[in-house]
A protein has these predicted regions:
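N-terminal Rossmann-like dinucleotide-binding module
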Residues: 1-54, 75-76
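C-terminal capping/lid region of NAD(P)-dependent oxidoreductase domains
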Residues: 2, 7, 129, 156-160, ...
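Predominantly a Rossmann-like dinucleotide-binding segment in NAD(P)-dependent oxidoreductases
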Residues: 18, 137-252, 379
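Beta-loop-alpha module in the N-terminal Rossmann-like domain of NAD(P)-dependent dehydrogenases
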Residues: 55-123
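Hydrophobic residues in well-ordered beta-strands that form the structural core
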Residues: 106, 112, 131-133, 162, ...
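Rossmann-fold dehydrogenase core element
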Residues: 119-136, 156-163
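Glycine-rich phosphate/pyrophosphate-binding beta-alpha loops
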Residues: 194, 276-284
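C-terminal glycine/acidic-rich active-site capping loop/insertion
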Residues: 218-262, 266-267, 286-360, 364, ...
Length: 396
């Protein structure tokens, strides 16, 4: 990467100018990169990119055209790329970039099928090109606080992790565009749940080996007011005034994903875990409980000012706990973690620095969520989660 070697800002591409494409701007803000190109099949998105990233950037209708573009020296016009396109396109785009020798930041989830996730890892291993998956919750203050408490031994050895996810903005975020379609997201237990499944694995120190899922389309399927919103982006229709949830309008024409789902997991280190999400709650936050051999912890709130409480003496009902730790930072939820995640990506592709995120862990979050979603749609049948190829895992 010539820009890296010269010490100048990296030349960055953004592929997919949607709701998450703004994350690339963090590299610009830090001075570590400059956005020089975007690719998106939508002409409206390409026009929007000029407003978002500045006039003068190169625009392409296809990521392959961007890959083929050459600079004055005959090399690639970019040093790295952010893939923030719809989930079902991640695999094709990421594999092409990796094979072209362009380091990649892939927005989570890594892919919508296990085969695609494994193919991306294989492409990274075979090409030797650096792959990074944007599991930004590993940089959320509430998560790092809980992990620090665990690693200090305050609750002993972890034996169980429970997460309840109240997705209060679910109607606006996931049921008015492609997220609502199985063909493009697989399901929200993957699209949304991959965040927390990854964190459950991280806090527990293991990966799921057996899962059972349950859930269904319990509310949004009853709303008949539908609209093709492909001419708009989520901020244009988002409103907290859309309450109660059955008053939502202009939902996606196709809705075949679950709006409530849950999964129980047995991990390969003997930890048991569960994750539940509901997309029509009035509030929007996630609540973790981690139980160990010498106590338990629980978070109340997940942004700045929230607290994590620890119980490590025997008692009855005691809401205060034995210790309380305040969450500092993350005033806007995991968006504050985006900056730290992008900074880590830049360091990783520049000098190979160690990362908190892991492409293998991202693959295992996909594997778990895909298996759990299959379980939901097959009568809640327990399903074994395939392990990653050990050789490939050593190379990415």
């Amino acid at each position: 990467m010539s820009s890296t070697e010269a010490g100048s800002p990296l030349r960055l591409a953004v592929i997919g100018v949607g709701a998450r494409s703004y994350i690339a701007s963090h590299a610009v803000d830090s001075g570590s990169g400059t956005i020089v190109a975007v690719a998106d099949p939508s002409s409206a998105a390409r026009e929007r990119a000029a407003e978002q990233f500045g006039a003068g950037i190169a625009t392409f209708a296809s990521h392959r055209d961007l890959i083929d573009a050459r600079d004055a020296q005959g090399g690639s016009i970019v040093d790295a790329a952010f893939v923030t396109s719809p989930d079902h396109t991640h695999a094709e785009i990421a594999i092409d970039l990796l094979r072209a020798g362009i380091p990649v930041y892939v927005e989570k989830p890594l892919a919508i099928s296990l085969d695609d996730a494994d193919a991306i890892l294989a492409a990274a291993a075979e090409s030797g090109t650096r792959l990074y998956v944007g599991h930004n919750m590993r940089h959320m203050a509430v998560v790092t606080l809980m992990r620090d408490i665990i690693q200090r031994g305050e609750i002993g050895e972890v034996k169980a992790v429970w997460c309840r996810h109240f997705v209060g903005n679910g109607g606006d975020y996931y049921f008015k565009d492609w997220h609502a379609e199985r063909a493009k997201s697989n399901g929200l237990l993957l699209q949304k749940g991959a965040h927390d499944i990854d964190i459950i694995h991280w806090l527990a120190g293991g990966y799921s080996e057996l899962v059972t899922g349950m859930g269904g389309l319990s509310l949004y399927g009853d709303i008949t007011d539908r609209r093709d919103n492909s001419d708009r982006t989520m901020p244009e229709w988002f409103s907290l005034d859309a309450w109660p949830p059955l008053s939502q309008t202009e939902l996606n024409p196709v809705i075949d994903v679950e709006d409530i789902s849950m999964v129980t997991m047995r991990l390969d280190n003997g930890v048991y875990a569960s994750y539940q999400q509901c997309h029509y709650t009035p509030d929007y936050w996630r609540n973790y409980t981690v139980i160990g051999t010498e106590g338990r912890l629980e978070n109340f709130g997940d942004t700045d000012g929230a607290v994590v409480r620890v119980w490590n003496t025997r008692t009855t009902y005691d809401p205060a706990g034995d210790a309380e730790y305040r969450v500092n930072g993350d005033e806007r939820g995991h968006r504050d973690a985006d900056r730290l995640t992008v900074d880590e990506f830049i360091r990783f592709i520049t000098d190979g620095s160690e990362t908190e995120t892991s492409a293998v862990a991202a693959r295992n979050a996909v594997a778990t969520a895909v298996a759990a979603t299959e379980s939901i749609r097959d009568g809640s049948r327990p399903i074994a989660v395939p392990a990653v190829d050990e050789h490939v895992a050593t190379l990415v």
